[in-house]
């Protein structure tokens, strides 16, 4: 694969594609433990759900770039993105969106209206606690649904890490003028 990257680096378009991939890979964080947890029976918090959404968005941006350059075939993670981004904004943040539950949307509107009306704090607090319960149920449901993407997430993380190393090696070989050794029958030559 290093030779594939070296061939890409020979053209301006290939260099641009490789540089774009490198910039995107620089955003990659080590979320191995979070991805491992998708294989278990745990409930993710908002930070872990954000990590998974950000990772899936990044993988989806990289997938066509890596495929066009014939570097790697990343698994499709649109299902993860759709699950964690029900409004389809494709922004790298996570929030328990109102789109997950009409009841949650209604409660949030009631809380806001009562606060603006100067309602008794205990009434607002009761609504707030109910909204937190609904959010927790949504997090639990999302965590269960994410289990089916465990292998794809793991494969994408492994391939993205591998791709980062291969590109770095190819760029080092190019920058240092390294050549691939070849075994010959006749003579040996050194450059």
Task: Pin down the residues of each PLM region.
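Conserved amphipathic alpha-helical "coupling/scaffold" segments
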Residues: 1-107
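Charged/polar positions within long, soluble alpha-helices
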Residues: 7, 11, 33-40, 61-68, ...
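Charged, alpha-helix-enriched surfaces in structured cytosolic catalytic cores
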Residues: 19-26, 47-50, 54-57, 99, ...
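Generic preference for flexible, low-structure residues
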Residues: 47, 65-68, 147, 169, ...
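Extended, charged alpha-helical coiled-coil/arm scaffolds that mediate oligomerization and mechanical coupling
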Residues: 76-164
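Conserved NTPase motor "head" modules and their coupling/switch loops across ABC/AAA+ ATPases, GTPases
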Residues: 158-191
């Amino acid at each position: 694969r290093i030779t594939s990257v070296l061939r890409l680096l020979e053209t301006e378009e290939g260099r641009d594609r490789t540089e774009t991939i490198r910039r995107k890979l620089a955003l990659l964080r080590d979320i191995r433990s979070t991805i491992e947890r998708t294989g278990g029976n745990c409930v993710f918090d908002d930070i872990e759900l954000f990590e998974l959404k950000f990772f899936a968005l990044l993988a989806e941006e990289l997938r066509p770039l890596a495929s066009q350059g014939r570097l790697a075939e990343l698994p499709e993670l649109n299902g993860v993105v759709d699950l964690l981004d029900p409004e389809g904004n494709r922004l790298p943040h996570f929030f328990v969106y109102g789109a997950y539950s009409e009841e949650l949307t209604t409660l949030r509107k009631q809380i806001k209206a009562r606060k603006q009306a100067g309602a008794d704090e205990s009434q607002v607090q009761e609504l707030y606690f109910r909204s937190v319960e609904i959010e927790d149920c949504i997090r639990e449901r999302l965590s269960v649904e994410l289990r089916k993407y465990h292998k794809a997430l793991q494969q994408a993380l492994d391939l993205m890490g591998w791709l980062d190393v291969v590109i770095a090696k190819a760029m080092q070989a190019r920058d240092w003028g390294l050549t691939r050794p070849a075994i010959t029958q006749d003579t040996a030559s050194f450059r």
